[in-house]
Amino acid sequence: RQQYPIITDEKIASYLSELGDRLVAAAPTELKQPVYEYSFTPVNLKEINAFALPGGPMFVHRGMIEAADEEGQVAGVMAHELSHVLLRHGTANMTKAQNPWLQLGQIAGAVGGAVVGGGAGYAITQGSELGVGAALLRYSRDYEKQADLLGAQIMAHAGYDPRSLARMFETIEREAKNSGGEGPQWLSDHPNPGNRTQYITEEATKLTIASPPDTSEFNAAKKAFAAMPAAKSMSELAKSKRGSGR
C-alpha cells in the first residue's frame, strides 16, 4: 500500500478550505445536508484532477491548481464537484452498483481517515487512484450537465464568472489531446455532455454575479507550488515506492 500524498503546508491547506467553504456558503440551502462534513484537501499530484466523495470530502490535485489561469477556474471545478455531492449523484450511483456496499467500502477504505477527519496521508491500493474509477464516482452525461448548471449558479453566488468553468474544461480537454488520448482521469469520470461551453456560457448570462472575492491567495498558492519540488504523477509515485521497497 502507498500513501496518498496530502499537502500539509498550512497556507495552502487553509486557502483551499476557505475557497471550499465560500462555495458551500453559496450553495442552495435546500440542497445542503446537515449531516455532511465538507472538507477540502490539497493533494501533491500533478494530474489535473479533483473529486468529491459522498458525504462531503473533496480532494483537489496540485496539478488542477497549477493548470488554472485564475482562481475562478479552480472554484468552477470545485463547485462542479460540490454539486455532485449536493445532488447526491454518488449515492444514486451506489444504488445502481452491482454490490453497492462493496463499492462504498472500497472507497471508504481507500480514503481511510479522510471521511472522519484523517491525518497527513491516506493509504490507498497501489495502482488505483483512490477508487475514482469506481462506479460511485463515474458520472453519466445527464449528471454532468446537472452539476455544470448547479456549479455555475454556485459560482455566481460566490462571486465567480461561470465562464471560468467552461475555460477550465477546455484546458482539461486540451491536455487530453496533447497527451495522445491518455488524458486526465477527470475526463473519464466526467464525460462531456456535449455543447458544454455553450450551455455554461448561456447559463452565465442569466445569472447575477456577486461581488468578486479577493483572489490574492490563489497567486500566493501558485508561487508556493513553484518553490516546491515538482509533483509526481500517480504512476511515478507507484514506481518510486516500488523502487524503495515500500
Regions found by a protein language model. Name each.
Residues 1-246:
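A Zn2+-metalloprotease active-site environment signal
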